[in-house]
């Protein structure tokens, strides 16, 4: 079409040129329209030039192709207090509505919903009107306060959300109270199911821990029985030693010698016993008290037996601690105060 318009203008100028003839027309054409000048070369060169010109026009047309689409393809309306964004998806060219929660949802949630709805979307992002990219963590309520650009693949949508009046301080405080009440209501309604799931999880954990502990517990009971037996023998041996010492001193005092001779002997025996108790304190850093001495002797025999039997005492202690912690958590979970029961129900359960 541009070539036809050029030829018409050329014929008009030539007809007005008069005496210039073909030469004048050719000069005028070459000077004013170099792209449409009449060539004096051979016909086949002119034919080649005519085939090369449309390629340059096509390249120019592709370079200035616009990717901005009208804003009507993306609309934002409020339904029941929630923003509903309608977007024309690129794959099937059909509109799809996305209902968002202004408080809990973010820009990242909206972008993920777009990609999940249309698998043909390779790149999607949101930019501010001045070209700054909006972070995925930005809330929907903040995004809808101003205009923004939605970029889907190579298409850019200018979105103009409807303006809404900002809440006053009193309305915002009332809204926060309503949110708190809704959260408490949700917790009250769902706490029973949560309690059951948590209790089932703790019971399963207890069963698993007890199964792991069962073989170790059998070995521990056997080692403990042997250590208890040896400790009892030591205690009875101490009593037998004291009885034997008493009999020997009585024999020497009343039958063999007199008290005047045995009195210094008993003094040194008593002082030697005091030295032995002090040596026990120096070695063990514990006072020589019979129950503590007995427990210490029991532990010595137990650790010797565990080492001899290759009993994994560290693993046993870890399992016992885990079981105790799980039982404590289960008891705390079943506590009426933790499930927000009224005081009257607590009194009835007691």
From Swiss-Prot:
Changing residue 256 to V: Strongly reduces calcium channel activity. Changing residue 251 to W: Strongly reduces calcium channel activity. It comes from Mus musculus (Mouse). The lineage of its organism: Eukaryota, Metazoa, Chordata, Craniata, Vertebrata. Ca(2+) binds at residue 263. Belongs to the MCU (TC 1.A.77) family. The gene is Mcu. It holds the Pfam family MCU. The keyword Transmembrane applies. This is Calcium uniporter protein, mitochondrial.
């Amino acid at each position: 079409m541009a070539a036809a318009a050029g030829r018409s203008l050329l014929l008009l100028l030539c007809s007005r040129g008069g005496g210039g003839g073909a030469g004048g027309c050719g000069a005028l054409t070459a000077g004013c329209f170099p792209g449409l000048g009449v060539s004096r070369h051979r016909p086949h060169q002119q034919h080649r030039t005519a085939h090369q010109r449309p390629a340059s026009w096509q390249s120019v047309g592709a370079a200035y192709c616009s990717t901005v689409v009208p804003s009507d393809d993306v609309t934002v309306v409020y339904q029941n207090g929630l923003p509903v964004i309608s977007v024309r998806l690129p794959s099937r060219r059909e509109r799809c509505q996305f209902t968002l929660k202004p408080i809990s949802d973010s820009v990242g949630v909206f972008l993920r919903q777009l990609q999940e709805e249309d698998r043909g979307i390779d790149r999607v992002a949101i930019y501010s009107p001045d070209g700054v990219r909006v972070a995925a963590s930005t809330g929907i309520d903040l995004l809808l306060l101003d205009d923004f650009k939605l970029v889907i693949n190579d298409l850019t949508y200018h979105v103009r959300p409807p303006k809404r009046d900002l809440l006053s301080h009193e309305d915002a405080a009332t809204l926060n109270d309503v949110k708190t009440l809704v959260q408490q209501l949700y917790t009250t309604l769902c706490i029973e199911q949560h309690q059951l799931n948590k209790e089932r999880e703790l019971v399963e954990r207890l069963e698993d821990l007890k199964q792991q502990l069962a073989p170790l517990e059998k070995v521990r009971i056997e080692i403990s029985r042997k250590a208890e037996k040896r400790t009892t023998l030591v205690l009875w041996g101490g009593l037998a030693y004291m009885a034997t010492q008493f009999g020997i001193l009585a024999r020497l005092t009343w039958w063999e010698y007199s008290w005047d001779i045995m009195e210094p002997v008993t003094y040194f025996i008593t002082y030697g016993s005091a030295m032995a108790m002090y040596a026990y304190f120096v070695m063990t850093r514990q006072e020589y008290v019979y129950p503590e001495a007995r427990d210490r002797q029991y532990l010595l025999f137990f650790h010797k037996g565990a080492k001899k039997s290759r009993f994994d005492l560290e693993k046993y202690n870890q399992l016992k601690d885990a079981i105790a912690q799980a039982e404590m958590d289960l008891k705390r979970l079943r506590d009426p105060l933790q499930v927000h029961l009224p005081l009257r129900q607590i009194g009835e359960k007691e």
